A protein has these predicted regions:
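Hydrophobic anchor at the start of a short beta-strand
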Residues: 35-38, 103, 172
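Predominantly flavin-linked oxidoreductase catalytic cores and closely associated redox partners
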Residues: 52, 119-120, 124-197
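Glycine-rich active-site loop/strand segments that organize a redox cofactor
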Residues: 57-105
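Mobile, glycine/GP-rich and aromatic-enriched active-site lid/loop segments adjacent to catalytic centers
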Residues: 98-127, 131
């Protein structure tokens, strides 16, 4: 008998759309904080863009003092400041080192995995999700965010078999990335979702 991948006995508290770096971090953190989390990825594996960034090495962050790093943000600074106060570049470095990824600082205070492999960063994020009980479904394309008035209550998606499904959930995090590299799955889906809200 086939296991249903889109409907669990226990409903989810959080659905995260997009299994890139931001999506995996959001999903893992929500689950670590006791939430039942579903992570939906339209590609066949997670972290595709992470795996190719920095010429395959992944420039994780910058090691400059947090205040200096934050002061460089000009666009959406009002959003960035509280988010960065919660989890800044130093916290990112600690996160990956605790996950077993040895890091090194290079010219310009850029931080890379010592192995020189972006794969290590993507793997650490995926393991973070698994360790915290995140349910991940791949080859599943979210087609819209379901709303009632101004309240979000779930997502519509097409599963890997081509069937349209709905998953109700009180919290949806859209982490679909921008339009920078469509071959990795960054096709701007999040922009469409936002314009529909």
């Amino acid at each position: 008998m086939e296991q249903l991948e889109e409907k669990e006995i226990i409903p989810y508290d959080v659905i995260v759309v997009g299994a890139g770096a931001a999506g995996m971090m959001a999903a893992g953190t929500a689950a670590r904080n006791g939430k039942r989390v579903l992570l939906i990825e339209k590609m066949e594996k997670s972290g595709r863009k992470v795996r190719i960034t920095g010429k395959g090495r992944c420039n994780v962050t910058n090691a400059r003092p947090a205040e200096e790093f934050a002061s460089q943000v000009r666009t959406n600074a009002e959003f960035f400041a509280p988010a960065f106060a919660e989890f800044n570049n130093r916290a990112a470095i600690r996160f990956f080192e605790r996950a077993g990824v040895k890091l090194e600082i290079e010219r310009g205070e850029r931080v890379f995995p010592r192995s020189g492999k972006a794969w290590d960063i993507a793997t650490a994020l995926l393991e973070y999700c698994f360790e915290n009980g995140v349910k991940i479904i791949y080859n599943t394309r979210v087609t819209g965010i379901m709303t009632l008035g101004s309240k979000v209550f779930g997502v519509r998606y097409i599963n890997k078999r081509g069937f349209e499904r709905k998953e109700e959930c009180p919290n949806v995090i859209v982490a679909t990335g921008g339009l920078s590299y469509p071959a990795t799955g960054s096709t701007g889906d999040g922009y469409a979702f936002a314009s529909d809200l």
